[in-house]
């Protein structure tokens, strides 16, 4: 590919386009012994710039697999993912590494912080990997910790923080390189109800203030309903009539018949 999708000009072009992410005919299969597993089975959808979209569905529906492919942490068996006008498949390994570190931020269910490092050092890690000087990275990390309400915890070891605080640090780390696309895989799954609510409110505020495009996989239906749209995955497919369902942040259209069973049934 002649020009990187993530140089300044092309990143700006991708994020100013109405459609930031497009998925076409995405299929993922792997083998477990003699059995073929298909976590994603030919799904297609698009996400507009600035949307906050939730993905819900039963365990094993393909939510995590989808996010990993969108983050270029896994590759599809068939189909394509586009970031702006560029297909991820067309990117070189160097460009994919830049895409992962610059265009995308990822929040995991388990925060994956380094427990013996301070909160600020954890947030600074992505910037250090990109070659920023230590002092500059730590100053930026402090600013991000201030945004998530943890400026007073900057010098504290990550392992000493509460679960909700650790996830706030993880969110700050995911945003440290100022990505256009934020992916979150069950970011509130390990938290109590109050902490989950606080973390979701924080993500919503940051989504708006930093003009992010956010995709959230969650089992929490009450949170999903507060995003702009809900996509329901079941057995690797988008549920017909539910793709594009509006959450309360969008229109107040009624849920299609049977939707409640899909999104509030066995999501464990």
Question: Positions of the model-derived regions?
Answer:
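ABC family nucleotide-binding domain
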Residues: 19-226, 230-235
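ABC-family P-loop ATPase nucleotide-binding domain
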Residues: 1-29, 240-268
């Amino acid at each position: 590919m002649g020009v990187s999708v993530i140089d300044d000009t092309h990143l700006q072009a991708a994020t100013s386009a109405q459609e930031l992410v497009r998925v076409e005919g995405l299929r993922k299969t792997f083998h477990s012994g003699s059995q073929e597993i298909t976590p994603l089975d030919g799904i297609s959808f698009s996400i507009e710039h600035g949307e906050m979209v939730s993905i819900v569905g039963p365990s094993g529906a393909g939510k995590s697999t989808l996010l990993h492919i969108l983050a270029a942490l896994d590759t599809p068996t068939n189909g394509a993912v586009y970031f702006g006008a560029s297909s991820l498949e067309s990117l070189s390994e160097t460009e994919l590494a830049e895409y992962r570190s610059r265009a995308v931020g990822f929040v995991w269910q388990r925060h994956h912080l380094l427990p013996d490092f301070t909160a600020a050092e954890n947030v600074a890690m992505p910037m250090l990997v990109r070659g920023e000087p230590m002092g500059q990275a730590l100053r930026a990390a402090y600013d991000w910790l201030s945004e998530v309400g943890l400026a007073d915890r900057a010098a504290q070891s990550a392992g000493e923080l509460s679960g909700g605080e650790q996830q706030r640090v993880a969110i700050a780390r995911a945003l440290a390189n100022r990505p256009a696309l934020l992916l979150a895989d069950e970011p509130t799954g390990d938290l109590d109800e109050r902490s989950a609510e606080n973390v979701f409110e924080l993500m919503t505020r940051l989504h708006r203030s930093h003009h992010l495009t956010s995709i959230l996989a969650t089992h929490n239906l009450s949170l999903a309903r507060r995003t702009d749209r809900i996509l329901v995955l079941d057995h690797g497919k988008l549920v017909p009539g539910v793709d594009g369902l509006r959450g309360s942040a969008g229109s107040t259209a009624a849920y299609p018949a049977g939707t409640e069973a899909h999104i509030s049934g066995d999501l464990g």
